[in-house]
Design a protein with these regions (language model features):
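N-terminal glycine/serine-rich phosphate-binding loop of ATP-dependent small-molecule kinases
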Residues: 1-79, 125, 132-155, 168-187, ...
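Conserved phosphate-binding loops in N-terminal lobes of ATP-dependent enzymes
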Residues: 6, 13-17, 25-28, 32-41, ...
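C-terminal, non-catalytic interaction/recognition modules in large multi-subunit enzymes and RNPs
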Residues: 9, 137-145, 276, 286, ...
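Glycine-rich phosphate-binding loop of actin/hexokinase-like ATP-binding domains
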Residues: 28-34, 79-85, 105-108, 245, ...
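Glycine-rich beta-strand-to-loop/alpha-helix junction loops that act as flexible
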Residues: 63, 157-159, 187-189, 238-239, ...
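Conserved short loop/turn motifs at secondary-structure junctions
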Residues: 155-164, 206-209, 417-422, 445-453
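Terminal amphipathic helices with adjacent charged low-complexity linkers/tails
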Residues: 155-203, 207, 381, 587-611, ...
Length: 681
């Protein structure tokens, strides 16, 4: 068992990275994602890398299984068991209209339909005292009915259970005994915060995806074991940490953004190694583009995440790195509406059939086809030559779309391709503004850190759109999310509802609660990972008294009222543009993050070995207002540390191509990263 291995299942490709800590060697592979059985793509990656599962010491795994099941409504047949009188909480929700200007607004249907939501007699008071005892006889009759209904999974939510989970825990034990083949989960095993709609939504989502995730992981463990794998399988959590299989099967909702998070962790590690305090992590894959901020070396982790977006989605109370995702990937389809307006995405051609240029039956033009028509992709060296791209097929598809929109003649396909990329740039720029400008931050104060198969190709265009002066392309950007998973630590988050005005007495009470959460987290990390050395971070959700929305503020172990208040005022002003130093501040919740360090690869060993024999070539490439010019083509593994040149240029490697615009200067850094300095910035 030589290798530490990470596998990332993306919307279009599945990536594998294997690192030998002793020999300090690395192996990469990539294979199209297989939607019928995700595990097939994992084993295809093993074959391409000439490795077997028996050579793996451990395997870190990120997957889009959970988010796909939620968005595509492909989960289990699920029932909700709740307190009498609260059957319709999923439909009542918050009773608000998130987008008041959308005249056709409609909220998404609940994951669990009304006929599968059931009430039982029980009630807790807000302080945790029992008002009405749990009727176990009623539960027994309900279990019989659920079995007859063919229910595969049950979510349990009782009012005020965050204050006293006894009834939920008793109901879960009862249903597990009476329905041994069903998946049973309850809200207080996932979150101990108030807000009844959010907790109900969380447990409903967890129950909905639970059977599928459990079956997938157990089958993958079995298949890996058959191949000789004897190490632990660890899952990439949405909080930026690794989770054990047991914890994942109990809390599969913790994987809701499992796939993209690995790249965020990798971006943070590289930013620290390169001495960059502030970077925007930008991941453009085949299906979507994602972005997140690293500010002062840290990611922001949100305690509530909206599946499908705030406007039409639904919330889950689970820690997720603050990441924004838009439907603008390499496979995003370009199309025209009835009014003759051009759109890009969110529909994607995926890996099957894929873009037109893949030659697998796709007939709708995509972002990848547009890049190929403009000369920005090498048709003979895509994925290292594993796939030859059909230039004429892409040109025909884009030309046909252009004809419908009035772009005729020989220049029509070029103009149409430029339009497709311009729209995708605006969409991706909007995502970056959402994580920066909407939080009171200026993207010009950050470096743009680009990875994914399409990130390096679009990074400079995006930086120009936002006036960002520096673009960083890490080694192996096409496999970078998997690299990030090898750089992740184990992490467990705990949270508690905690209310009170910010004063000395409240701070003293909070320390007692934090100490209890810390003891619980230490025990969990020791049990799951054998960890003895644990790092701890404390945060509090706070607001001005009388307000509705909270902000999350870091607080030190020795924090006093003055220092905590100062931190709150500072963060509040940055977020909203003002602060009131005289207003009373109140706490609403406490959050704890506990980390156990894992062995990491040496970043200097991650680039492939240089091939200094490669020769520089040339190709005609279209660069917007610069027209079609001759660009030099470099092989990335032929560029040594310190190499520098000026665009127009393309830097090709397995799985990705970096585009350098005319006049921009690029150089190879100490970790073999590409640094692109935009002209005029």
């Amino acid at each position: 068992m030589r290798y530490a291995i990470a596998v990332d299942i993306g919307g279009t490709f599945t990536d594998l990275v294997a690192y030998d800590h002793d020999a300090r060697q690395v192996v990469y592979s990539k294979s199209p994602t297989t939607y019928d059985n995700f595990a097939d793509a994992i084993f295809h990656c093993f074959e391409k890398a000439a490795l077997t599962p028996a050579e793996a010491r451990f395997l870190n795994h990120g997957t889009t299984l959970v988010i796909n099941a939620l968005l595509q409504r492909k989960g289990a047949r699920t029932a909700l068991v709740t307190t009498k009188g609260f059957r319709d909480i999923l439909e009542i929700a918050r009773g608000n209209r998130p987008d008041p200007f959308d005249l056709h607004y409609s909220r998404s249907e609940p994951l669990i339909p009304r006929e599968l939501r059931f009430e039982v007699s029980e009630r807790m008071a807000a302080d945790g005292t029992i008002v009405t005892a749990l009727d176990t006889n009623e539960l027994e009759r309900l279990a019989q009915r659920l079995t007859e209904e063919g229910i595969e999974s049950v979510g349990i939510f009782f009012m005020n259970s965050y204050a006293n989970p006894a009834h939920e825990e008793a109901a879960a034990r009862c249903l597990q005994q009476l329905m041994p083949g069903a998946y049973v989960t309850h809200s207080t095993s996932l979150t101990r915060q108030w807000y009844e709609y959010e907790r109900t939504s969380t447990v409903a989502a967890n129950a909905y995806v639970g059977p599928g995730v459990d079956a997938y992981i157990r089958r993958l463990e079995t298949d890996l074991g058959t191949g000789g794998f004897g190490g632990p399988l660890l899952m990439m959590g949405s909080n930026g940490g690794l989770l054990s299989v047991e914890r994942t099967c109990e809390q599969p909702i913790a994987l809701v953004e499992s796939g993209p998070i690995g790249g965020c962790i990798g971006a943070g590690a590289y930013a620290e190694a390169l001495g960059l305090k502030n970077v925007i992590a930008f991941d453009m894959g085949g299906t979507t583009a994602k972005c997140a901020l690293v500010e002062e070396g840290r990611f922001s982790v949100e305690s509530t995440y909206y599946v499908g977006g705030y406007t039409k989605g639904f919330p889950i109370q689970s820690p997720v790195i603050d990441i924004v995702e838009v439907g603008a990937g390499g496979g995003s389809i370009a199309w025209a509406d009835a009014q003759g307006r051009l759109h890009v995405g969110p529909q994607s051609a995926g890996s099957t059939p894929g873009p037109v240029c893949y030659g697998r039956g796709g007939d709708k033009p995509t972002v990848t086809d547009a890049n190929l028509v403009l000369g920005r992709l090498n048709p003979d060296n895509f994925l290292g030559g594993d796939l030859t791209l059909d230039v004429e097929g892409a040109r025909q598809a884009i030309g046909d779309l252009g004809e419908r929109l009035g772009y005729h003649g020989a220049e029509g396909p070029l103009q149409m391709a430029e339009g497709i990329l311009a729209i995708s740039t605006v969409i991706m720029g909007g995502a970056i503004k959402q994580v920066s400008v909407e939080h009171g931050l200026d993207p010009r104060d950050f470096a743009l850190f680009c990875y994914g198969g399409g990130g390096p190709l679009h990074g400079v265009s995006l930086a120009r759109e936002l006036s960002i002066p520096l673009v960083i392309i890490p080694p192996e950007p096409g496999n970078f999310s998997a690299i990030g998973m090898l750089l992740a630590d184990a992490r467990i988050d705990r949270s508690e509802t905690f209310t009170g005005l910010l004063d000395t007495e409240t701070i003293a009470r909070s320390r007692t609660v934090f100490e209890a959460m810390e003891a619980e987290a230490r025990e969990a990390l020791a049990r799951d990972f054998g960890a003895q050395d644990v790092l701890l971070e404390r945060h509090a959700e706070m607001r001005y008294r009388g307000q509705r929305h909270n902000i999350k503020v870091p607080i030190g172990r020795a924090g006093d009222v003055a220092s905590i208040a100062a931190a709150f005022h500072r963060d509040y002003k940055r977020r909203y543009g003002h602060a009131d130093a005289q207003a009373a501040i109140e706490l609403q919740a406490l959050h704890l993050a506990a980390f156990a360090r894992q062995q990491r690869p040496d970043l200097a060993c991650l680039p492939r070995q240089p091939d200094l024999e490669s020769k520089v070539q040339e190709r005609r490439v279209h660069f917007g207002g610069h027209g079609t010019v001759t660009a030099r083509i470099f092989r990335r593994d032929a560029l040594p540390e310190g190499f520098s040149d000026t665009g127009p240029a393309l830097i090709e490697e397995y799985g990705s191509t970096t585009l350098v615009w005319p006049g921009d200067r690029f150089e190879i850094g100490t970790l073999r990263e590409i640094r692109i300095h935009l002209a005029g910035h």
